[in-house]
Amino acid sequence: MDRKDFIKNSTILGSATILPVNNVFSRGVNENGIDKLVDNNGNFIQKSLPYNKTFLEPHMDEETLHLHYEFHHGGAVKGANKDLDNIKKHLKSGEMEMVDLWTRKLAYHFSSHVLHSIFWTNLTNKKTQPKADLLKQIEKDFGSFDKLQAYIAKVSKSVEGSGWGILGYQPYSQSLTLLQCENHQKLTQWGVIPILVIDVWEHAYYLKHKNKRGDFVDTVLDIIDWDNVADRYNTAIKLR
């Protein structure tokens, strides 16, 4: 079995990643853009940012964006490839304890890859608003856009340690839900498709905001690309 088939058939060996590789995310908003997580040979890949590294200034500085994308996100992609190679190697030799170790590492690294890839596309350099079907769903599930904003802010600012605030679509209940994810893979819900994510690891904000996570979250909420979120929502609801 080659690497591509191994990934496809294993759906990451049942690890606690948010989505299997071939789910709606990898078929998502732009097949040839940053949403493409895997190449034709089954290797995890990091596509280019959808904008230059000064695009988000002054909201997000160039140095933070460079370090975050190149080393933290990039490191997760390298880690996921290493993890998968080690899983295959130890499966072949029958060392199941090592398979367990590398499967847990893959859950961490691949979930990081998924969330970072969504995060970059969720951001723009101007204020936008949700509209049309997405706005109707927000109002149905949260009462109003303002209430959703307050809820996302609270969830993101209150993550214990490092993690993410996540707005996702739950196809089983046909509703939007908010998750408070620790690390990249803990406290998730099976089936939820992330459509908006906020990274609250310190590497996302410390150079500019120091220890003031709340200020960073408020800044991010001012530059969410709600058109991108709507695209992800419209893709996700097709699973109903």
Regions found by a protein language model. Give the residues of each.
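All-alpha RGS (Regulator of G-protein Signaling) helical domain and cognate RGS-like helical scaffolds
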Residues: D39, F71-G74, I87-L91, M96-Y169, ...
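N-terminal export signals
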Residues: D5-F25
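N-terminal targeting pre-sequences for secretion and organelle import
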Residues: D215-R240
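Second-shell loop/turn segments in exported
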Residues: E62-H66, T103-R104, D225
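C-terminal segment of N-terminal export signals and the immediately downstream linker at the start
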Residues: V21-P58
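Structured secondary-structure scaffolds
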Residues: E63-N81
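An amphipathic alpha-helical core segment
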Residues: S156-K157, G161-K210, F216-I224
